[in-house]
C-alpha cells in the first residue's frame, strides 16, 4: 500500500470515528436529525485527498468545512425570501442544516446535496457506489469551489468511480437549469472573496442520467459558497451574491421537480 493510500485510509477512519463519537455524545441534529422541513441544506462530509489542509470545523480539519456554516445561514435566509419552499433555516452554528456522509442512510432523505472544495475530496469505492445509488434514485449533487486542472483531476478521479460510464458535459445556455425560474443564460464567473485561484475561465458542467435529467451540477472555476457566505460583507460585491442566490434557487427548484 502506498504512503498516499495509507494516509487517505487513515483520514477516512478518523473522520468516521469522529462522526460516530459526535452522534453518540450529543445527539446533534446536524449529524443525526430527521428532516423537519421540505428543504434542508445538506452538506456532504468526505475525507480529503492526501495532502489536503483546507477547512476546519469542530476541531476537525477537512475541505468539506469550507464556508461552514455562514454559507448555509445566508443562503437559507435568501431562499426563504425568494421562494415559497418550506425551508429549514440555519444558524451560524449550522443548526437546521444537515451534515451527511455517504455511509449514512439518511442521505436518501435529502434530495439536494452540496459538496464544496471537491478538488480536495476523496471517495473510496464504497462511497462512490453509494453516491451513484443516491443520484440514480433521484438525488441531485451540486459541487462548487474548485479551480484549475490539478483540482479538476482530483475531482474527476473520484467521480469516475461513481460514473465510469457517464461523461461530464458543458451545459448550454438554453439548458432548463438556467431558466427554471431565473433566466441565467448570461453567465458570469462568481469569484471567491480572495479572487480567483488557478482557474480563469468559469464552466457550468454536468452529468446526466439516461433520461436526460441533470444529476450533478458542476461549478468549476467559481465559488458560489463564498458569495453566499459573504452576503453581508461590504468587501464582497453584492451583484455576485445576488447572482449566486439565483443560481442556487434554480438548482433547488430543478432538483425538487426532476
Protein language model regions, located:
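Surface-exposed patches in mature extracellular/periplasmic domains of secreted proteins
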Residues: 85-98, 143-146, 166-174
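Extracytoplasmic/secreted envelope proteins and their assembly/folding machinery
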Residues: 72-76, 128, 132, 152-156, ...
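Aromatic-Pro/Gly-enriched surface loop or interdomain linker
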Residues: 22-112, 118-119, 223-224, 230-258
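An acidic, glycine-rich "communication" segment
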Residues: 49-56, 150-230, 240, 245, ...
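Short alpha-beta junction capping motif
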Residues: 41, 107-152
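Bacterial N-terminal signal peptides
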Residues: 5-21
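Sec/Tat-exported extracytoplasmic proteins
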Residues: 45, 79-86, 117, 139, ...
